[in-house]
Design a protein with these regions (language model features):
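Short, charged, amphipathic alpha-helical segments
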Residues: 74-79, 101-108, 127-137
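Short, solvent-exposed, charged loop/turn and helix-capping segments
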Residues: 84-104
């Protein structure tokens, strides 16, 4: 009878553990929301405004590329646009999970386009600079198309 009682206690403990495990919030936390909350939208708008502030300066960069002012192109990329990757990452982290990977890829390619533009400026390569500036503009606009 003592063995039977021990067996029942162990079985009951396993059943209770299993039932409690099904109802934990960890399972619910793994499922991401399909829509934005108002707090998420506010945060996204704040971070996107910081990225947009840099975007408002893109015509300046374009004018420098067009004028083939390579020193100022490099300074501009390393100065005001030096924070771009971090700012894009902040926005990306606050997107819905389904959009984060695509945003991460676009942000990475945009940063690579800026780095290539900087290399082209150092090499005085007009064609590469024009191509990388155009690629960056496209990627920048594609990134903003993911935002709500």
């Amino acid at each position: 009878m003592k063995r039977f009682h021990s067996f029942i206690v162990i079985l009951l403990a396993l059943v209770i553990t299993f039932v409690i495990g099904l109802g934990t919030p960890a399972h619910a936390a793994r499922q991401s929301p399909a829509v934005y909350t108002s707090d998420q939208l506010d945060t996204l708008q704040k971070y996107a405004a910081n990225v947009q502030a840099l975007g408002d300066r893109l015509p300046e960069l374009g004018a420098l590329v067009e004028a083939e002012d390579w020193i100022h192109v490099s300074n501009f990329i390393r100065g005001p646009f030096g924070e771009l990757r971090a700012r894009l990452s902040r926005v990306t982290r606050n997107l819905l999970v389904k959009d984060q990977e695509q945003a991460r890829q676009i942000a990475k390619k945009a940063a690579e386009a800026l780095e290539s533009l900087d290399r082209a400026a150092q090499d005085n390569n007009v064609q590469a600079a024009d191509a990388n500036y155009a690629a960056f503009l496209t990627l920048y606009n594609n990134f903003f198309s993911l935002l709500p």
